[in-house]
């Protein structure tokens, strides 16, 4: 039971496995097999691969693990981190956008809206933690690099 609880606690397991199963099941129960918009399907592997590749990249350059439960040893400012501070979370968001578009579902859109807010709040909390960990060098990085959209936000 402890392993299962830990598995469900993983944000990536919930994003890439649990939510798609739940949303497909709810859509199927409500009205049979949902009509899928296949043109949006590439967003699903894009979001998944972005999360995993950026996580491996950050771990390679910064040490630690892909999440803050095993925090980095160094600030990573190279690659995609030169343009945005939270590309791993953005991978989750791209996946949820893809899921909402593929399913063309109000429920999937509501799940996306919830996660837009949730990941923004989580990123802000992570950034406070990293500022405590790395001090002024991290605060300077935050002044130079936007949270989500390069040069904008």
Predicted regions and their residues:
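Membrane-anchoring alpha-helices and their flanking helix-loop junctions
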Residues: 1-81, 90-153
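Extended, alpha-helix-rich binding/interface surfaces that flank or overlap catalytic cores
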Residues: 86
């Amino acid at each position: 039971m402890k392993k299962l609880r830990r598995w469900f606690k993983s944000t990536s397991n919930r994003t890439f496995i649990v939510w798609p199963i739940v949303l497909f099941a709810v859509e199927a129960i409500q009205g049979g097999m949902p009509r899928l918009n296949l043109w949006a399907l590439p967003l699903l592997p894009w979001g998944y691969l972005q999360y995993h590749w950026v996580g491996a990249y950050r771990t390679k350059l910064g040490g630690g693990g892909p999440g803050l439960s095993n925090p980095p040893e160094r600030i990573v400012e190279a690659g995609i981190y030169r343009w945005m501070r939270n590309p791993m979370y953005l991978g989750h968001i791209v996946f949820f956008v893809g899921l909402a578009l593929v399913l063309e579902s109000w429920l999937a859109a509501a799940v996306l809206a919830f996660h837009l807010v949730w990941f923004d709040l989580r990123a802000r909390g992570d950034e406070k933690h990293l500022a405590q960990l790395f001090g002024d060098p991290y605060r300077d990085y935050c002044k130079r690099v936007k949270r989500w959209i390069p040069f904008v936000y």
